[in-house]
Amino acid sequence: ETKRLRFQVEKVLQMSMFERQKATLKMKEIDANELISGVINTFALKVERYNGKITSNLEATDPVIFADEMHITNVIFNLMDNAVKYKKPEEDLELKVRTWNESGKLMISIQDNGIGIKKENLKKIFEKFYRVHTGNLHDVKGFGLGLAYVRKIILDHKGTIRAESDLNVGTKFIIALPLLKNN
């Protein structure tokens, strides 16, 4: 299931990044808490394989957004997949996923205890084809499109995304999306 989803994510990444225009979005009403729960369930086995654990705190009382289900699923999957890819080899992975409401928006955060990102690299991580050099620490495959895709999809949904990170402590991605009622 995880492999199938990764293949789908890669395929969508390749397609959408080489189209200059907005991704074609099939917008509909979505309960983001439900969608995120689904991704967490799909991902749980993979995280357990690394002796990791996912804790979720889906506290948004209004989780309803107007969004493209496949693309938002890919965004959540991609950020969680990065947490696995960039985990510390000597430490069990801890993944914290949270939703809440703040000033008319749905907020989503995905936090890990991985290798983290240097401050000077942080502003570049959303650029197309940019990859942080991690040495030979990880068997990380890909095109450096993941976060560029994530950012593009969030922006196409009139949202924002930012990252906070401390080297050797971990990374936290924070997404803000407009609620359906405010869209």
What label would you give each PLM region?
Residues 1-5:
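Short alpha-helical segment of the dimerization/phosphotransfer core of two-component systems
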Residues 20-25, 64-67:
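Conserved micro-motifs of the catalytic ATP-binding
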Residues 117-129:
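Short conserved segment of the HATPase_c
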Residues 26-31, 48, 53-63:
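Conserved catalytic submotifs in the C-terminal HATPase_c
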Residues 92-104:
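Short beta-strand/loop element within the Bergerat-fold HATPase_c
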Residues 83-84:
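Short helix-loop "hinge" at the ATP-lid/N-box region of the Bergerat-fold HATPase_c
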